[in-house]
Amino acid sequence: MSSLDELIQKARMLLSEGHSPGQIADELSLSMETVTWLLTQKKGDTAPKDVHIDWTVVSSNGHLLDGIASLMIERYYCAHPFESVEGQCPSLGSNAIVGIALSGVPLATLIAQKEQMKLAIYHPAKHSSGENPVGSISGNFSQVGGENAIIVDDVITSGRTMHEVVRYLRRHKATPLAIWVLFDKLGIKEVEGVPVYSVFTISRID
């Protein structure tokens, strides 16, 4: 069985278990367009150009996940060599971490714990139902009004969710300072003026 056949089977299995296309896209680290194709494609149809990322070896292991969270913090510090004050630790310049559900949440939680910051959770519109789905901040965690925030997720695929969360934060009087991701499939430097700090950039060579 080819890796494409396996992806098709996995996408259809997740759908049969009640996952929405948006949730399937997150589970497989694929774009919504690719997931739609996996679920509906007919034999001979051309597949969308995308890259499947499987990092479950890390994401399923608490110790490794903790190490990746530390790596994301260090990556930001390396890009911003803060002038140190004797006897004090450098500061991120932010007081809140916004984790994007689903896969951004454990990373954001670990980062917030390490940096002693507030933790907010964002549910993107693609996880909502109804005719006009909208994204929202969970009421069970920190709110974002008036906060300087760092946005955290595992993958940038199409960039739509990042645009969505940046606009949401600004509408709710928060200031997005940076976007941290493990994998960037677009190779972008910023989203609506907010700088992107990825650990890995994924490029497709056709």
UniProtKB/Swiss-Prot annotation:
Q: Which domain of life is it from?
A: Archaea
Gene3D superfamilies reported for this sequence: 3.40.50.2020
GO biological-process terms attached to the record: pyrimidine nucleobase biosynthetic process; regulation of gene expression; UMP biosynthetic process
Which GO MF terms does the UniProt record name? DNA binding; orotate phosphoribosyltransferase activity
Keywords from the named record: DNA-binding, Transcription, Transcription regulation
UniProt cross-references to InterPro entries, sorted A to Z: GfcR-like, PRibTrfase_dom, PRTase-like
NCBIfam families given in the database record: PRK02277.1
Its domain comment says: Contains an N-terminal DNA-binding winged helix-turn-helix domain and a C-terminal regulatory domain (or effector binding domain) resembling phosphoribosyltransferase (PRT) domain.
Similarity section = Belongs to the purine/pyrimidine phosphoribosyltransferase family. GfcR subfamily.
- Full protein name: Transcriptional regulator GfcR
Q: Which organism is it from?
A: Methanosphaerula palustris (strain ATCC BAA-1556 / DSM 19958 / E1-9c)
